[in-house]
Amino acid sequence: MVGLGKRLWVEGVGTAWVVFIGCGSIVLNTGAVQQGYGVLEVSLAFGLALVTASYAFGAYSGAHFNPAVTIGFTVAHRFPVRDLLPYIAAQILGAIAAAALLVYVASGRPGFELGASEFAANGFGEHSPADYQLHSALVVELALSFAFVLVSLMVTCRRKLRPIAPLVAGASLMIVYMVSIPVTNGSINPARSTGQALFVGDWALDQLWLFWAAPLLEIGRAHV
């Protein structure tokens, strides 16, 4: 059994990797006309980041990298309650570290303004990429958080599927991001939303509640 300290370190590093690669594909690839790649490319970046992190660190920590996943596994009695809060704290710290590194890198581009770019933060209303309102954002985050956690639970409970579990999880994340990016800029991960919101501040912090509430409301349904 890997010690808790090492597992927390791995969860933090893995979360940082997923957030930096995924959000970096939006923030750092900025042209004069449009910020970031298209929905497909950004979704692929998040999915591949999860696949690589899961294969690299899964044997140590279980490769959650997402508070919603950790809570889902806890509710399903497949993760110890005593480790729940430490895991979530490690994931949030990893996401914040990734966001801080992204700010530092992005600031090297002339004309970069953190507030103006919205920094890949999640939002709804006027802060939705396609101006989707609160009810649309809530439904999308609820449904897709449920689907993603459910897939994670199901694929890891089947021994024969465990070798390909990172691929399935990555593909699932890619699919849910393809749907959610136009609506909320794609969350499905409260840690990812928190890291970006802390640096954007203002509206991003005001709307952060949705990206914690949506996955938490759906966790019970993902119990299998």
Language model region names:
Residues M1-H223:
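Membrane-interface helix-loop junctions and terminal tails of multi-pass membrane proteins
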